[in-house]
């Protein structure tokens, strides 16, 4: 776990991180690295690691957030199911930048038959020298639902960063069942926490980090295809335009 005079873990679901409110705080979000660290994925891993290294050196962020599918224990793509080894290698890579980082799980971090489940991966990531992570409440759906409250030196919360586990696959199991989502109990927990913060600052805003796109993404895509000018396309493509996109 990251050790700093500016960071304090107040309970099993909350960190406070003191920042200079007079300076910009830069957060770099990275997603879907799909690092396999196996013989099949060796070439793609090298490309991904080189790209991430260039991005981090150019961006010079104050914090990095990995929003899921960081590792990929999928035999046909990686040549290994050993996500324990993958997690340790990812952690070593991220620690090498000496920048605080945190993460949420995606649907690929713990594939069927992989060595570790999410609870076990959580214990690994908590060993990271620069990693900020906790499992969160056991009674909540998912693993890794927690807050990092960016706070001023006078202990006022400036910006809550909400980490949410958007879970893995649907009720049918793996792949063909579609994807899971952020569950109602997670939303209720999140809003309760935010409402508590609003008692001190009614105008407070928050940022949430998660892997699965919610239904609003599908609605925006539908409007864009219909030529709705209220939707602005910026960059990128959508590979999954079916019922698996936006839930």
Located regions from the model:
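Active-site environment of divalent metal-dependent phosphoester hydrolases
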Residues: 36-39, 72-75, 103-115, 169-172, ...
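Active-site-proximal beta-strand elements of phosphoester/diester hydrolases
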Residues: 25-37, 158-171, 209
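Extended active-site neighborhood of metal-dependent phosphoesterases/phosphodiesterases
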Residues: 2-19, 85-202, 232-235
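Sec/Tat-exported extracytoplasmic proteins
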Residues: 34-37, 56-60, 94-98, 194-201, ...
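Active-site neighborhood of phospho(di)ester-bond hydrolases with catalytic His/Asp-centered motifs
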Residues: 29-31, 64-69, 101-107, 207-210, ...
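Active-site-proximal segments of metal-dependent phosphoesterases and phosphodiesterases across multiple
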Residues: 201-247
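N-terminal active-site segment of His-dependent metallophosphoesterases
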Residues: 1-84, 89
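Short, flexible/disordered intra-domain loops and linkers
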Residues: 39-44, 75-83, 113-116, 175-179, ...
């Amino acid at each position: 776990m990251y050790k700093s005079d500016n960071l304090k873990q107040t309970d099993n679901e909350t960190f406070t991180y003191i920042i200079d409110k007079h300076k910009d705080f830069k957060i770099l979000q990275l997603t879907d690295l799909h690092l396999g660290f196996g013989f099949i994925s060796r070439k793609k891993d090298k490309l991904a690691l080189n790209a991430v290294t260039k991005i981090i050196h150019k961006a010079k962020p104050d914090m990095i957030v990995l929003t899921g599918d960081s590792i990929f224990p999928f035999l046909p793509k990686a040549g290994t199911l050993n996500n324990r080894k993958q997690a340790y290698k990812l952690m070593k890579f991220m620690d090498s930048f000496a920048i605080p980082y945190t993460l949420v799980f995606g649907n690929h971090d713990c594939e069927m038959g992989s060595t570790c489940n999410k609870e076990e991966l959580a214990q690994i990531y908590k060993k990271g020298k620069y990693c900020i992570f906790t499992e969160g409440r056991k009674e909540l759906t998912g693993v890794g639902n927690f807050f990092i409250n960016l706070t001023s030196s006078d202990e006022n919360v400036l910006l809550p960063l909400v980490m949410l586990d958007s879970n893995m696959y649907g009720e049918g199991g793996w792949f063909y069942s579609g994807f899971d989502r952020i569950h109602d109990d997670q939303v209720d927990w999140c809003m309760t926490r935010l409402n508590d913060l609003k008692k001190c600052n009614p105008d407070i805003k928050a940022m949430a980090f998660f892997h699965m796109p919610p239904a609003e993404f599908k609605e925006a895509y539908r409007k864009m295809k219909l030529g709705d000018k209220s939707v602005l396309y910026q960059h990128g493509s959508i590979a999954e335009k079916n019922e698996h996109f936006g839930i």
